[in-house]
């Protein structure tokens, strides 16, 4: 049976240096990192956030835009990013499908789990867009939900750091990397892995969460294909020494 993974990228990772828009070089880099996975037989699902375009929380903080409307705007932003990512993957000769939780048939397919799984079985990449289709849920939760639905072996949160730390390593030089932790430990307030809903969903379904640095070339291949887990953090139901 082929290994099936769900990889979550933040929208900010796609942004230009000013934090906005879509950086074509980053798109190209991500696609170049995904291609070896597909070529080796890994079935790949992707979720990308929309923070480089708009965040629902930020859009609604002045009180003019309702939070629910802000979240829908954020969902539309993820569709924009998903289509951009689809183009980059196809540039590398890969076959990719965008499935949206909100129907927009002229742009992408609606999310249908059986169709998504069939695409994966045929070696196509599926990019899941528009979150869960509901406001008040993050793209981390959407990614975890899709990972569970498609029967992924793991969910990988590809970030700008090489794992989970006890505090922000960009602010605190003495931050300690946590190589292995349980779901309950990941739910602690000072440990930022994903939001609580996403972690609880992963826990209920025994879905391993892997946090790694997306900007280290070959890292995804090393983790997924070579099973090299030294350069990441893993969240599971128990620690390695238990």
From Swiss-Prot:
Activity regulation as described: Inhibited by UTP.
Superkingdom, natural source: Bacteria
Gene3D superfamilies for the chain: Acetylglutamate kinase-like
Residues noted as binding UMP in the record, renumbered to the chain: 50, 71, 132-139
Matching InterPro entries: AceGlu_kinase-like_sf, Asp/Glu/Uridylate_kinase, Uridylate_kinase, Uridylate_kinase_bac
Residues that bind ATP: 8-11, 51, 55, 159, 165, 168
Places the protein is found: Cytoplasm
Pathway where this protein functions: Pyrimidine metabolism; CTP biosynthesis via de novo pathway; UDP from UMP (UMPK route): step 1/1
Family: Belongs to the UMP kinase family.
Subunit structure comment from the entry: Homohexamer.
Protein name: Uridylate kinase
